[in-house]
């Protein structure tokens, strides 16, 4: 038996993050007096270093290593860069919030890095086993982060719900993967694609496996009918953790959906498209209608996120029409653009909640934003940009994300789906505009001046301005998405 030494070069960033997570654990153990600041600083250095390594090791052509378990392509590289950026911004936004509550412990940052490593493995997986390992590493880190505040009964309850439902979803996903292996005889995603294309797979077992696979993907995206955990976890976790849950994992879940469904099961698209269609429509309808009744902003954004993920799925399901992949590139590019847009908007929305929160006070109710324009006209404008963008009002990034997806849906011939999506967007605009009305036309319930670190103010301002700026010139990001997906094909 010959042992082939794998090529470590494409996976340098993953190895670097894993090593740095161990270094931070050891360093903070022996430097207790400066452990909190040291862990935070080293974590940001790690994310910046990983970004530099990923950029320098990027390959325009797809390469595989570790017995084809790891794939290095532009899709993985770009999503990893976005994950680093999202995690760095989330940690920066949350630092003062955590410090006020004595939660900025080294373990928090180690868990954040391990979660990042899990997402990196997910987006670069060409094998069902490595995909599952990355998913579990991300999930277990998230469970611990949700329960990180041991004095919060609400957080502990949310973590328990998240863990139980997450374990169930992981079991369903693993069962689906085992059935795919039974149907195709391989665990490699590229091998599964070849087996399905050559009609060498057992169709009955394959379709059963696809159903369980879809259940796992839908849970990680937080869409109907696997959405039950989203509102409770968003509400129960402290806002710094909610910010993390609502952003980077969505990019990893998008990558998982693309790798498994588009790359691996493209030739049975007519089956998973039908499932995705009903899931997406139900998510858009339920998400928007449920959000209207919410008075807690975190729960409102949770239901809003369910709706947004439904929109993203519309892009994925519109790629193939009657076996013709003519519009596939445009549709999948629209879905990727939507995922990126949602992450940018979520960073700003939860960042604003953190900005208005202080020790002993959580600004998570809609009434807490009353009269914000009188307290801070600048940040009221930033929050207005976020709400307008999420509502899909021209000319913000959210408008063009929805427009791109709707164009793909119409091109695929799903006119009734587009009509429902537009109608729900109009209805959903109510709860976004309600917050704008509260900020500009109600009297402030709290006249306390906004106190926040300079870096939070600067980055949050840049975040809000980016939502408007990309909305004015979205073509650059759309072109990037198209180029990345065009260059990222199975080797």
UniProtKB/Swiss-Prot annotation:
Q: Which UniProt keywords apply?
A: Cell inner membrane, Cell membrane, Membrane, NAD, Quinone, Translocase, Transmembrane, Transmembrane helix, Transport, Ubiquinone
* InterPro entries per UniProt: NADH-Q_OxRdtase_suN/2, ND/Mrp_TM
> Which reactions is this enzyme annotated as catalysing?
a quinone + NADH + 5 H(+)(in) = a quinol + NAD(+) + 4 H(+)(out)
A Pfam family hit: Proton_antipo_M
What's any GO biological process attached to this entry?
ATP synthesis coupled electron transport
Q: Which cellular compartments is it found in?
A: Cell inner membrane
Q: What is its EC number?
A: 7.1.1.-
Question: Which stretches are transmembrane?
Answer: 11-31, 38-58, 74-94, 106-126, 128-148, 163-183, 206-226, 243-263, 272-292, 301-321, 336-356, 379-399, 410-430, 465-485
One cellular component (GO) term of this entry: plasma membrane
Spell out the molecular function terms from Gene Ontology.
NADH dehydrogenase (ubiquinone) activity; NADH:ubiquinone reductase (non-electrogenic) activity; quinone binding
Keyword Transcription regulation part of the UniProt annotation? no
Question: PANTHER family attached here?
Answer: NADH DEHYDROGENASE
The protein's job, in short, is:
NDH-1 shuttles electrons from NADH, via FMN and iron-sulfur (Fe-S) centers, to quinones in the respiratory chain. The immediate electron acceptor for the enzyme in this species is believed to be ubiquinone. Couples the redox reaction to proton translocation (for every two electrons transferred, four hydrogen ions are translocated across the cytoplasmic membrane), and thus conserves the redox energy in a proton gradient.
HAMAP family documented for this protein? NDH1_NuoN_1
Assembly behavior: NDH-1 is composed of 14 different subunits. Subunits NuoA, H, J, K, L, M, N constitute the membrane sector of the complex.
Q: What name does the UniProt record give this protein?
A: NADH-quinone oxidoreductase subunit N
Q: Which gene encodes it?
A: nuoN
